[in-house]
């Protein structure tokens, strides 16, 4: 006669206790936002380390070339300030808006969002980490462009420290917009097109002086988040900058950045569950 241990019998008390213990096992703690964001940020920096030099070369020398071309057209004064400020912010738009839209568009089309969905990181960390990494790529190019423009047009460089605030705030606004465009576009080709159109709008409406634009075009210019970064830089080139207006422009960049990154996070959640 074979003997069966009591603990393996379905109706035994031991089996019930073990089943309850397994069912009551707790999940691990949820990943916190800040450590997850830093991890995604470092991963994005490492991923793009090889492509960073040619990326900065293209973004920077594109803006420098535009300033050289405009040197023979613009005499000085407010027009020169607009050209230098617009060319500096264009570096941010090229990377944070254009390239980030392409990146998220390709990531969605290739199924890369499924990989991020399996990681124990909040959706906001993925969007903010990628946006922060792409925005940080623009720091050297923006500084070089602004300094070169000041030398080329004879503008003062005493207040270029305002770039410390303009780059992250304008970068957040444009990166959030680029991420949202890439995640909401149904096809990667459309995401690339939208990113290119956004960068072109930042170029044309940021470099050209606003007082020469028609009223309709000027209204469109006011809708772009890059405009307020351009205005903040351009105001500091004056003899006596009105810092209240500068802070107002930076505040608009910050609000638009918060809203655009929130929309991008929602778009990431929407795309990841499909």
Residue ranges of model-derived segments:
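Hydrophobic transmembrane alpha-helices and immediately adjacent juxtamembrane helices
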Residues: 1-144, 149-153, 165-173, 177, ...
């Amino acid at each position: 006669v074979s003997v069966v241990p009591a603990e393996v019998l379905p109706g035994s008390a031991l089996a019930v206790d073990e089943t309850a213990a397994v069912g009551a096992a707790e999940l691990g703690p949820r990943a916190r936002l800040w450590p997850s964001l830093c991890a995604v940020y470092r991963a994005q920096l490492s991923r793009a380390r090889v492509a960073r030099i040619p990326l900065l070369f293209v973004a920077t020398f594109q803006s420098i070339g535009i300033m050289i071309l405009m040197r023979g057209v613009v005499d000085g004064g407010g027009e020169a300030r607009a050209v230098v400020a617009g060319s500096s912010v264009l570096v941010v738009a090229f990377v944070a808006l254009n390239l980030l839209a392409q990146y998220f568009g390709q990531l969605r089309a290739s199924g890369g969002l499924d990989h991020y969905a399996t990681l124990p990181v909040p959706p906001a960390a993925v969007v903010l980490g990628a946006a922060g990494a792409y925005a940080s790529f623009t720091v050297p190019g923006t500084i070089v462009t602004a300094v070169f423009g000041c030398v080329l047009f004879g503008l003062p460089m005493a207040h270029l420290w305002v770039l410390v605030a303009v780059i992250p705030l304008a970068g957040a606004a444009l990166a959030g917009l680029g991420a949202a465009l890439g995640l909401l576009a149904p096809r990667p080709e459309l995401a690339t097109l939208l990113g290119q159109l956004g960068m072109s709008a930042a170029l044309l409406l940021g470099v050209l002086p606003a007082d020469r634009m028609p009223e309709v075009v000027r209204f469109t210019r006011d809708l772009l988040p890059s405009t307020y970064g351009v205005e903040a830089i351009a105001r500091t080139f004056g003899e006596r900058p009105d810092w209240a207006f500068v802070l107002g422009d930076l505040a608009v960049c910050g609000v638009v950045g918060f809203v655009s990154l929130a929309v991008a996070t929602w778009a990431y959640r929407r795309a990841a569950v499909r």
